[in-house]
Amino acid sequence: MRKERLIESLRNYVSERVVEAMSRVPRELFVPEELRPMAYEDRPLPIGHGQTISAPHMVAMMCDLLDLREGMKVLEVGGGCGYHAAVMAELVGPSGHVYSVERIPELVEMARRNLERARYRNVSMILGDGTLGYSEQAPYDRISVAASAPDIPEPLKEQLRPGGRMVIPVGSYSQDLLVVTKNHDIRVERAMGVIFVPLIGKYGFKDSFW
């Protein structure tokens, strides 16, 4: 699928602002070289170490649900190859910042190379257990989780700013994409059914269920 066709198809799902952000990110720089001819197919692609780059429509829908704005500080859990972080970086702009936590060292290095090559300077890749969040920069306006947890990790709730929003898949074989809003209490709404790789960590799964 050509990039133009993919971008046009996304208009069926999300706001024009998200579509424009997606159009500015060169997805071919974030997939393994041998898969570049498939970079603009609307499906997940393997990036190694049992992980995938999410399908473009899913990245777009998660960004739309997050309602990302200029200047926001964002925590991403499950940074993978850096593609989703790049789209969010477009949406928060140069005055915002994305802190992306990834547990696999090789993917952290891959993402850093990809982001540098694509010239994204408002993304920081951090090696660590994403279920613990990243307290050094908390609280966050938005939290995006790109792997499915057994439940919403408590540290992520704590690191979400009052008035903030989190999008997270929850479940094992059957998963729900949840939108979590924090005000005087925590409100959780189901957005849709999804399929993500498991979130591994202290407040996640102990091992893959695939």
UniProtKB/Swiss-Prot annotation:
It comes from the Archaea. SUPFAM superfamilies: S-adenosyl-L-methionine-dependent methyltransferases (SSF53335). It catalyses: [protein]-L-isoaspartate + S-adenosyl-L-methionine = [protein]-L-isoaspartate alpha-methyl ester + S-adenosyl-L-homocysteine. Gene3D superfamilies: Vaccinia Virus protein VP39. One of its GO terms (molecular function) is protein-L-isoaspartate (D-aspartate) O-methyltransferase activity. The keyword S-adenosyl-L-methionine applies. PROSITE patterns: PCMT. Its EC number is 2.1.1.77. One of its GO terms (cellular component) is cytoplasm. This is Protein-L-isoaspartate O-methyltransferase. The gene is pcm.
